């Protein structure tokens, strides 16, 4: 009777150990997912600030000399200063010559632990932000 009782407890100990391992794996996966999501969100918010600053710089440059090319160059310079890993998107600098309002679109890949390495989640790491601003009034 004692041996049967010990075997029963051995089987339960294995099941409990397996449940602990499964729960630890689930907790780790949830933690990594939360960190990746936070990184993507932070990158999106930061990129919006970069785009806003660049659009303001470009609008001010356009007000100083109404040249679309120099305004877009000012935007690129602002982006480089604010975040060297962010890039101005193709056709990401649009200047309304009538109003002096500039729309800037900036792209960047968020740094993640897992999302950037998996093909079905990689597109979530490619972040873009578009901001529109006019020249500052002094």
Residue ranges and their predicted role:
Residues 11-13, 88, 129-130, 138:
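Low-complexity, flexible helical/coil segments
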Residues 13-19, 94, 102, 118, ...:
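Compositionally biased, intrinsically disordered low-complexity regions
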Residues 2, 112-138:
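Low-complexity, S/T/G/P-rich flexible repeat/linker segments used as non-globular hinges
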Residues 55-110:
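Short amphipathic secondary-structure patches
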Residues 2-73:
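Alpha-helical assembly-interface signal, strongest on the long, hydrophobic N-terminal helix that forms
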Residues 51, 104, 129-131:
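Residue-level preference for non-acidic, small/hydrophobic
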């Amino acid at each position: 009777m004692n041996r049967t009782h010990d075997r029963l407890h051995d089987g339960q100990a294995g099941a409990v150990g397996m449940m602990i391992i499964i729960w630890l794996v689930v907790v780790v996966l949830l933690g990594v997912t939360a960190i990746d999501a936070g990184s993507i969100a932070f990158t999106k918010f930061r990129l919006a600030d970069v785009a806003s600053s660049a659009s303001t710089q470009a609008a001010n440059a356009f007000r100083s000399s109404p040249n679309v090319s120099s305004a877009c160059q000012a935007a690129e310079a602002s982006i480089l200063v604010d975040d060297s890993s962010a890039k101005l998107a193709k056709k990401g600098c649009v200047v309304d010559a009538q109003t002096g309002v500039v729309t800037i679109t900036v792209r960047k890949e968020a740094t993640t632990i897992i999302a950037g390495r998996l093909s079905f989640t990689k597109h979530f790491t490619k972040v873009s932000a578009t901001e529109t601003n006019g020249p500052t009034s002094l």
